[in-house]
Amino acid sequence: MKVIFFLFTLALSFDSFAQTNKDKYHFFELKVYEYSSLEQEKVIDEFLSSSFLPFLHKNGRSKVGIFSNYGNDTSAIKKIYVLIPHKSLNEIPVLQKAFFQDKEYMAIGKNYVDASSSQPAYNRITTYILEGFRFAPNLMLPNLKSGNNDRVYELRSYESASEKKYWKKVEMFNEGGEVDLFARLNFNAIFYAEVISGPTMPNLMYMTSFENMNDRNEHWKAFSNDPKWKELLSMKEYDQTVSKNVTTFLKAKAYSDY
């Protein structure tokens, strides 16, 4: 009888968890558009602001982040980053198909949708599929006072030499307390996530935000000097868990929800 009661209680707990999390967006899609001309940038911007973003809003994505490189971007290949939340992995292909079946938004985005092979709207798209960390599963909005021109969004990708070292780094963020440290120091995180599909696995990604570049530098100085961080650095189990750190500074597009 006790076993039956335990199983019944456990079932209720799982049901309660499911009800609590059914409206949560724990999966993220990070689409990176690569382009090389001002004409392409104009077409992509027009498509995202007038067609794709309104479509996403219509389909329940009220907070979508759209970013470009911070500062004077002199690189030959430029990029626009689009961060889209999802409730499940199944929603990703479903949403993509839904857009190309929506005649209204297809018509609005005609210049992008019907771009020719001789004048493509972009060079390539790289897509990362992400799952929010167990200690920080959702997208978060920053609490910043500065305007878009000053704000700095810092996207980091930590690559690991092996899956074992990767999972130790994920543990370091979660159970190890690195996520809590970022929160305590007010890093205004947008997300922390495992990369479950992407071109540089095994790796994790996260994004933090700041009032300006000076504010960013001061935050990282405080982080480096914090006793908790020094404690984590001294732990052998977390040694050499990151083999490559790719840091990208971004600014939000004027039409971004961030």
Region spans (language model):
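Short S/T/G/P-rich N-terminal loop/turn motif that feeds into the first structured element of a domain
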Residues: Q19-M106, N111-W229, D239-Y258
